[in-house]
Amino acid sequence: MIKGYEEEEWIPKTRLGRLVYEGQVTTFEEAVRSGLPIKEHQIIDLLLPGLEDEVLDITMVQRMTDSGRRVKFRTTVIVGNRDGYIGIGHGKDVQVGGAIKKGIENAKLNVVRINRGCGSWECGCGQAHTVPYKVSGSSGSVRIYLMPAPRGLGLAAGDVAKKVMEMAGIKDVWTRTEGSTRTTLNFAKATYNALLNTITVRS
């Protein structure tokens, strides 16, 4: 919990929130199968209590208004359990703590369960340690390609992509990138979008 911010008692406002609160939906998979949108971060708190969070970036944003210059902080945050679940979110607030808190809450609303496997022809161990096949994702000018790697290789990736994949439970991967990977926000989001494609299409 962030210092200075206490969690308020949760009173569910959505149908899915009430189902989770009342114990009628008890797993993340049941929540997804319900077809109901996850709009309250407390749903994830109850269904995935072991999530970790990590702040990838904090930037100061200045804006001129009629009353003068206003300063806000913008954060990029990831959450995950290092075993298949990953989410990314952004937060803005006049205080750093508030921006981090909002980033964590938004990241929880974007949690997905990715598919992992042993997709490398060099390996064949059968364990879920890498991506199941080649996938790619983009955000802004950044595009990243994730390719299956043999067990023990590690994460051949830039620092930001490495943190996202570690949080998702990917242990070995080859990567190739295009665009300005120095932009933390786009690099992290492109990596997240690539991991999303392990669920949807095979490329």
Swiss-Prot record:
Sequence ranges assigned to domain S5 DRBM in this UniProt record: 51-114
GO BP field: translation
GO CC annotation terms, alphabetical: cytosolic small ribosomal subunit
One Pfam short name: Ribosomal_S5_C
Signal peptide start-end: none
Molecular-function annotations in GO: rRNA binding; structural constituent of ribosome
Swiss-Prot/TrEMBL keywords: Ribonucleoprotein, Ribosomal protein, RNA-binding, rRNA-binding
Domain-level remarks: The N-terminal domain interacts with the head of the 30S subunit; the C-terminal domain interacts with the body and contacts protein S4. The interaction surface between S4 and S5 is involved in control of translational fidelity.
Annotated function: With S4 and S12 plays an important role in translational accuracy.
Oligomer status and interactors: Part of the 30S ribosomal subunit. Contacts protein S4.
Family: Belongs to the universal ribosomal protein uS5 family.
Protein name from the UniProt record: Small ribosomal subunit protein uS5
Lineage of producing organism: Archaea, Methanobacteriati, Methanobacteriota, Stenosarchaea group, Methanomicrobia
Record gene name: rps5
